[in-house]
From Swiss-Prot:
<dbReference type="InterPro" id="IPR019554">
    <property type="entry name" value="Soluble_ligand-bd"/>
</dbReference>
<comment type="similarity">
    <text>Belongs to the 4Fe4S bacterial-type ferredoxin family. RnfC subfamily.</text>
</comment>
<feature type="binding site">
    <location>
        <position position="383"/>
    </location>
    <ligand>
        <name>[4Fe-4S] cluster 1</name>
    </ligand>
</feature>
<dbReference type="InterPro" id="IPR010208">
    <property type="entry name" value="Ion_transpt_RnfC/RsxC"/>
</dbReference>
<dbReference type="InterPro" id="IPR011538">
    <property type="entry name" value="Nuo51_FMN-bd"/>
</dbReference>
<keyword id="KW-0411">Iron-sulfur</keyword>
<keyword id="KW-0004">4Fe-4S</keyword>
<keyword id="KW-1278">Translocase</keyword>
<dbReference type="GO" id="GO:0009055">
    <property type="term" value="F:electron transfer activity"/>
</dbReference>
<keyword id="KW-0249">Electron transport</keyword>
<feature type="binding site">
    <location>
        <position position="416"/>
    </location>
    <ligand>
        <name>[4Fe-4S] cluster 2</name>
    </ligand>
</feature>
<dbReference type="Pfam" id="PF12838">
    <property type="entry name" value="Fer4_7"/>
</dbReference>
<keyword id="KW-1003">Cell membrane</keyword>
<feature type="compositionally biased region" description="Basic and acidic residues">
    <location>
        <begin position="539"/>
        <end position="548"/>
    </location>
</feature>
<feature type="domain" description="4Fe-4S ferredoxin-type 1">
    <location>
        <begin position="368"/>
        <end position="397"/>
    </location>
</feature>
<dbReference type="InterPro" id="IPR017896">
    <property type="entry name" value="4Fe4S_Fe-S-bd"/>
</dbReference>
<feature type="binding site">
    <location>
        <position position="380"/>
    </location>
    <ligand>
        <name>[4Fe-4S] cluster 1</name>
    </ligand>
</feature>
Length: 693
């Protein structure tokens, strides 16, 4: 009984809720065999042609490349891209790519040389002798991605399905009304597709393999049945035509009866799905050693004179492909990449073909309905009835328009497959899929900002923790250093401080430096007085020479007369008499001398006058000489000259006797003595002036 029940369920087909039946236009392109096209003038290869980050560029401008040579490198979800032909790297710059936003992406521009030479290829004809990791790495380096639409890296997808996969589904449904790329590939390359499925079976070791195909492809069904022969490990399942039966979750439900939970992938229920085009690319990569450099693209639409399916090199500009189909750009402005339900209008015709590009639709004016104005939602619920994912399109529409991101997320916005069934049946002509795409992009941007903020916070917290650790380590080192200081170290520190204090004291004793005042006029009064005194001395010497012939020589000065006090008194008396004589004298020389020399007290340099003081001129000369010598001695003491200047006065005249006094040993004591002498001299001069008066 159980065996009979298993046989009854063996070929059973389930159905999914929702879906639509749009008019089919597949016959425009499905009846024409696959054909090769000429090489374009340049190839535009975007770095990102898959679901994941772009790879690292490994070529430079001006490099010569061969077909199949990697242009980028990457790991994990970062797939490399390869040169579609041999030629020269002409530029690496931003270029508009095949995306609904029309944004630019970094691309490599290659100018072909026309030789189309391959690089060295690595083949694994006996792939069963290789390890699974080796084959997965080879598929990754070949740049194999899902060709059914999403472009997920195949090696990463297979790596995630190594455990728990019971059913491998090969998707050949191709439910879009105009697209026939997989249909034509199954008709002409069924054997190679089956070889690719065998490689997948070797990698995954599933319990069963199901090949799903819609019943509107009779030629492809016949070709696959012929290629399968009498195989028992693979089963071909022909399903009813219904849009979108080619969706991953929908085909899983049709073939297995299992529903994929919200927010999950089919691997969560033990199912893994691959497209027939991906299976073909896997065979070419493993057995033939060819990286993914071309794919089948459908050229269809009534605006094309030669519709069909072509082998298009990745990076071929759309304009070049349309010319191969007989398309006139000046007559038809609109071109759709993809099908009429899930495709998008191209902003430019210079965008390149990428790994997920399966169709170029150039409709005529009769094929396109006039653009209808968007109306308000009437809550008819037709969109909910047509949704194959079991969502509430009306609620998602309101949440998207109201920027209610969390509510849209809670209502499973990201489970929407963007099939366009809701917009197709909407009587208000609301472009629901556009709202959903925009809302998804905004939520992804918010999530990325939140991730960056969280990462920045983690980095900030790590930095603060590191700074705290470094601070604690420094404090610990300082404490350990302070605790480990020995007595000898302290003595050395004290000795260094004592040397610094002694040096500062010595600098203070030397005195402050002489201050130089800019633009100041020098005081030459002392020099003028000295010259005048010298002239007076010369004249007096001449007079004394004449008098010395008549008078007796002067006696030597006794030691008692060398007393500084007596000398100071004598000098003061001489100055008083000199003033009086100067007032009465009419000689200009004596007046200039007495006015130029300031009244300063004499230093303790003893100049003893031993002659008679009746002559006023001699007294004035003697007083001038005493003042000059006193000024010189004072200047020498102020400038701290080490060697004192000895004062020697030669007198040949008998009335004046000059005695040289020894210089004091200590300059400070000499200065003090000089000051005392000046004070006493002033007092004595005042007393003598009072007596004379």
């Amino acid at each position: 009984m159980l065996k009979l029940f298993s046989a009854f369920r063996k070929d059973r087909i389930w159905d999914f809720d929702g879906g639509i039946h749009p008019p089919e236009m597949k016959t425009q392109s499905s009846q024409t065999p696959l054909r090769q096209i000429s090489l374009p003038e340049q190839f535009i290869i975007p770095l990102k042609q898959h679901l994941g980050p772009e790879g690292e560029i490994c070529v430079s401008v001006g490099d010569k490349v061969l077909r199949g040579q990697p242009l980028t490198r990457g790991k994990g979800r970062t797939l490399p891209v390869h040169a579609p032909t041999s030629g020269t790297v002409n530029a690496i710059r931003q270029h508009t790519t095949a995306h609904p936003s029309g944004l630019s992406e970094l691309s490599i521009i290659i100018v072909p040389d026309g030789e189309d030479r391959w690089c060295e290829r690595l083949t694994y004809r006996d792939y069963r002798a290789q390890s699974v990791d080796t084959l997965l790495a080879h598929l990754h380096q070949a740049g194999i991605a899902g060709l059914g639409g999403a472009g997920f890296p195949t090696a990463a997808k297979l790596q995630g399905g190594m455990r728990g996969i019971e059913t491998l589904i090969i998707n050949g449904a191709e439910c879009e009304p105009y697209i026939t790329a997989d249909d034509r590939l199954m008709q002409e390359c069924a054997d190679e597709i089956i070889q690719g499925v065998e490689i997948l079976s070797f990698l995954l070791q599933p319990k069963r393999i199901l090949i799903g195909i819609e019943d509107n492809k009779p030629e492809a069904i016949s070709a696959l049945r012929l290629a399968l022969g009498k195989r028992s490990d693979m089963q071909l399942r022909v399903i009813p035509t219904k849009y979108p039966s080619g969706g991953a979750k929908q085909l899983t439900k049709i073939l297995t009866g299992k529903e994929v939970p919200f927010g999950k992938h089919s691997a969560a229920i033990g199912v893994l799905m691959q497209n027939v085009g991906t299976a073909y690319a896997i065979k070419r990569a493993v057995i033939d050693g060819e990286p993914l450099t071309e794919r089948v693209v459908t050229l269809t639409g009534e605006a094309l004179r030669q519709p069909g399916n072509v082998w298009a090199r990745l990076g071929t500009p759309v304009r070049h492909l349309l010319k191969q189909g007989g398309f006139h750009v000046t007559k038809q402005p609109m071109v759709v990449m993809g099908g009429p339900l899930m495709g998008f209008t191209l902003p430019l015709l210079d965008v390149p073909i990428v790994k997920i590009s399966n169709c170029l639709l150039a409709p005529s004016h009769s094929e396109m309905e006039p653009v209808a104005e968007e109306q308000s939602c009437i809550r008819c619920s037709k969109c909910a009835d047509a949704c194959p994912a079991g969502l509430l399109p009306q609620q998602l529409y309101w949440f998207s328009r109201g920027q209610e991101h969390e509510k849209a997320r809670d209502h499973h916005l990201f489970d929407c497959i963007e099939c366009g069934a809701c917009a197709y049946v909407c009587p208000s002509n609301i472009p629901l899929v556009q709202y959903y795409r925009q809302e998804k992009a905004e939520i992804r941007a918010i999530d990325e900002d939140a991730q960056r903020a969280a990462l920045a916070k983690v980095r900030f917290d790590a930095k603060q923790a590191r700074l705290e650790r470094e601070k604690a380590a420094r404090e610990l080192r300082h404490k350990q250093a302070a605790a480990g200081v020995s007595t000898s170290d302290k003595d050395a520190v004290q000795a260094a401080l004592e040397r610094v204090r002694r040096k500062q004291t010595a600098e203070a004793e030397i005195g402050s430096p002489i201050t130089v005042i800019p633009d100041a006029q020098p005081d030459n009064s002392a020099a003028i007085a000295a010259r005048a005194a010298h002239k007076a001395l010369v004249r007096e010497e001449r007079v004394r020479e004449k008098q010395s012939q008549q008078e007796t020589p002067a006696t030597e000065v006794t030691p008692e007369e060398l007393d500084p006090r007596k000398a100071a008194v004598a000098a003061a008396l001489a100055r008083v008499k000199a003033r009086k004589a100067a007032q009465q004298s009419e000689l200009n020389t004596t007046e200039s001398v007495s006015s130029a020399i300031p009244d300063t007290a004499a230093e303790p340099i003893a100049v003893v006058e031993a002659q008679e003081q009746e002559d006023p001129r001699k007294a004035a000369v003697a007083a001038a000489i005493a003042r000059v010598k006193a000024r010189k001695a004072a200047q020498q003491l102020v400038t701290n000259v080490e060697a004192a200047v000895p004062v020697v006065t030669e007198t040949t005249a008998e009335p004046i006797a000059v005695v040289e006094v020894q210089e004091p040993e200590d300059p400070r004591k000499a200065a003090v003595a000089a000051a005392i002498a000046r004070v006493k001299a002033r007092k004595a001069a005042q007393a003598s002036s009072y007596q004379e008066e």
